């Protein structure tokens, strides 16, 4: 009885076995900073944050605001390359995207102000002139960019704060899956990726940022500070080719 193989009971008419099944470790070596790692693929998940139209596509929210979205599009190619390889190793893929309610009842004034600081122009939940409502769940802007195609087996989680752990089911899902190590990809590295990674670390997860699979439209020093702080305080930094190499050497995946 249970929704995930790592967290089930065995139930009969007169007794219940609460002993969870042992999940066989599937370790692989991973080049990372500040130290090399040994990671258990059986207890890992790969989280892709906010690779959605409002941040990464022409006609989306950032493009409407005049932001150069080139840095947010840069991770698309490496994410598209590594996700199938990670999936083939039976590592869960989690697509974590912004999506506020259309009535904005899950958005506070402080959150609304951050997206329209002068109170003018389109902000959260409002419609871009000639376009879709901004970051509304189910809207075009909340959809994953066309270049990244989730598999039906992948997991989707909607968030409405910068951190994907705040008031969402993400932590429950990961604990049901038995995950202890989380890989992070997506945008913006210094904002939603970083706050999600920080909350994960505070909750006791092992955190690995995949450097070539994250991007930000912030100034370069913001990315440098993000990588510095991840390595100093919150976890580790690796590259997607290192993940692929480690999985291949351990003969994990297809």
Question: Positions of the model-derived regions?
Answer:
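Short acidic, Gly/Ser-rich segments with clustered Asp/Glu that frequently serve as metal-coordination loops
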Residues: 52-58
């Amino acid at each position: 009885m249970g929704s995930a193989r790592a967290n089930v009971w065995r139930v009969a008419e007169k007794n219940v076995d609460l002993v969870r099944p042992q999940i066989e470790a599937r370790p692989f070596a991973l080049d990372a900073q500040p130290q090399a790692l040994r990671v258990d693929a059986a207890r890992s998940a790969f989280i892709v944050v906010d690779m959605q139209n409002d941040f990464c596509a022409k006609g989306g929210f950032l493009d409407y605001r005049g932001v150069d979205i080139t840095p947010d599009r840069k991770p698309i190619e490496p994410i598209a390359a590594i996700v199938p390889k990670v999936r083939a190793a039976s590592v869960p893929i989690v697509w974590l995207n912004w999506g506020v309610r259309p009535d904005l009842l899950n958005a506070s004034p402080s959150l609304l102000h951050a997206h329209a600081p002068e109170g003018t122009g389109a902000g959260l939940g409002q419609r871009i002139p000639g376009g879709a409502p901004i970051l509304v769940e189910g809207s075009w802007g909340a959809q994953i960019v066309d270049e990244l195609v989730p598999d039906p087996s992948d997991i989707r989680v909607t968030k409405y704060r910068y951190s994907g752990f705040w008031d969402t089911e993400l932590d429950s899902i990961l604990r049901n899956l038995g995950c202890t190590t989380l890989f992070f990809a997506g945008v913006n590295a210094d904002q939603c990726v970083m706050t999600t990674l920080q909350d994960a670390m505070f909750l006791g997860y092992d955190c690995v940022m995949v450097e070539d699979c994250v991007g930000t439209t912030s100034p370069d020093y913001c990315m440098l500070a993000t990588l510095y702080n991840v390595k100093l305080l919150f976890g580790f930094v690796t590259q997607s080719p290192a993940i692929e190499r480690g999985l291949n050497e351990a003969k994990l995946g297809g």
